[in-house]
Amino acid sequence: MAAQVATTKVPEVRDITRIERIGAHSHIRGLGLDDALEPRQVSQGMVGQLASRRAAGLILEMIKDGQIAGRAVLIAGQPGTGKTAIAMGIAQSLGPDTPFTALAGSEIFSLEMSKTEALSQAFRKAIGVRIKEETEIIEGEVVEIQIDRPATGTGAKVGKLTLKTTEMETIYDLGTKMIESLSKERVQAGDVITIDKATGKISKLGRSFTRARDYDAMGAQTQFVQCPEGELQKRKEVVHTVSLHEIDVINSRTQGFLALFSGDTGEIKSEVREQINAKVSEWREEGKAEIIPGVLFIDEVHMLDIECFSFLNRALESDLSPVLIMATNRGITRIRGTNYQSPHGIPIDMLDRLLIIATTPYTEKETRQILKIRCEEEDVELSEEAHTVLTRIGQETSLRYAIQLISTAGLVCRKRRGTEVQVEDIKRVYSLFLDEARSSQYMKEYQDSFLFNETQTSQMDTS
């Protein structure tokens, strides 16, 4: 009788790779300044705009100090001169602790809530509260876990947990909930854990170095830590950083914390905000909390109307106000909601409160360097001739159009099994995709063939 050999099918293990989308400003890492706030020509993804970046560096230092709130900055310049890039550079330089909220001018117009409510929520999102509290924790290395289960299978489980430090060892009695928490965290002998006495939360810090030579199958993510020193019970200061908007939402209704995840916050009453402001001020006086004025960035600010600007004038005078950064590419244009014209479409009384940073068009050398950085970001290799042609296109049309041709030319290159984008690839995508000037010329030539053409000089005789 032939022996049957059992074959075990080994499941295929796939690595989960992190997907990072490449955005228009994903190459920006900071403002590219040295310690003396002097801008480098090319640094952290920023190119040129030396005076604008130096001014933004001063604003950045003012934000980091956190002492001055309610200041407003306007970044004004032609399209494609790096206004949003400077704002993103400020955001990257601030770090994770300082709140940064970005929105476009048209985002505040909604049927669900009023314009002033949308602006109020944006302001509150950009103000952080650092709350300090002291908690008692038990920190030690697990020596042994004993769990006694009832013989009948029903009833409460009880057990004992032995913890030790370098100086002492103690046995704790365990209840049902603590046993479930230990099982959930998969705590075993040799683990270094912390237990929050107030909440009963168990956190596993890692494995003890004394167990490093054990013959256990451990994954690459296993961390080895020293056995804790001193007493088992310690007092630890925990710092929580939340925004004022999150506190507003949680206190606005029952089960308000669920609205933080769903995004359905709705309009929040002013009485709730006043109570929260009073409570936060009380915490500040007691030393329990610290206010972190963040940054609110409003792009395309000319889209706001006269009512929004009136609200901003009042909101900037509050002591709980972030640093407001705005950007616009408009010249002298009509203020939305009125028949009056003003520089950048912003009322004069609002302009009087602003520090204005001007951006200038990029030179050919700077355009070439920006395109080189974008090619590295999008993982596209260009030949020297193709780089020169693309730079000329960027100078004659716009920088955004030239950047958009990089990925399309890279795709054309891959389709022909090439490794480096050549001039022919640039020419092909240039002929396929029109820029603004060629599109306008095309419309002028064939305007009579399009429906609802409003530029026709002759009217049809309907008599």
Curated annotation (Swiss-Prot):
Binding-site list for ATP: G77, Q78, P79, G80, T81, G82, K83, T84
Keyword Acyltransferase assigned: no
Known EC number: 3.6.4.12
Record key words, sorted: ATP-binding, Cytoplasm, DNA damage, DNA recombination, DNA repair, Helicase, Hydrolase, Nucleotide-binding, Nucleus, Transcription, Transcription regulation
Principal place of residence: nucleus
InterPro entries, alphabetized: AAA+_ATPase (IPR003593), P-loop_NTPase (IPR027417), RuvB-like (IPR027238), RuvB-like_C (IPR041048), RuvBL1/2_DNA/RNA_bd_dom (IPR042487), TIP49_P-loop (IPR010339)
Free-text function comment from the UniProt entry: Has double-stranded DNA-stimulated ATPase activity. Has ATP-dependent DNA helicase (5' to 3') activity suggesting a role in nuclear processes such as recombination and transcription. Represses gene activation mediated by beta-catenin. Proposed core component of the chromatin remodeling Ino80 complex which exhibits DNA- and nucleosome-activated ATPase activity and catalyzes ATP-dependent nucleosome sliding. Involved in the endoplasmic reticulum (ER)-associated degradation (ERAD) pathway where it negatively regulates expression of ER stress response genes.
Catalytic reaction(s) noted: ATP + H2O = ADP + phosphate + H(+)
GO molecular function, one term: ATP binding
Keyword Nucleotide-binding: yes
EC class name: hydrolase
SUPFAM superfamilies listed in its UniProt record: P-loop containing nucleoside triphosphate hydrolases (SSF52540)
Family the UniProt entry places it in: Belongs to the RuvB family.
Complex and partners: Forms homohexameric rings. Can form a dodecamer with ruvbl1 made of two stacked hexameric rings. Component of the chromatin-remodeling Ino80 complex. Component of some MLL1/MLL complex.
One GO term describing the cellular component: MLL1 complex
Disruption phenotype: Fishes display embryonic cardiac hyperplasia with increased cell number and size by 72 hours post-fertilization. Gut and gut-derived organs are incapable of growth and differentiation after this time. The mutation enhances ATPase activity, rendering it DNA-independent and causes aggregation of the protein into large complexes.
N-terminal signal peptide: none
A biological process from GO: DNA recombination
Name this polypeptide is given: RuvB-like 2
Subcellular location: Nucleus; Dynein axonemal particle
UniProt source species: Danio rerio
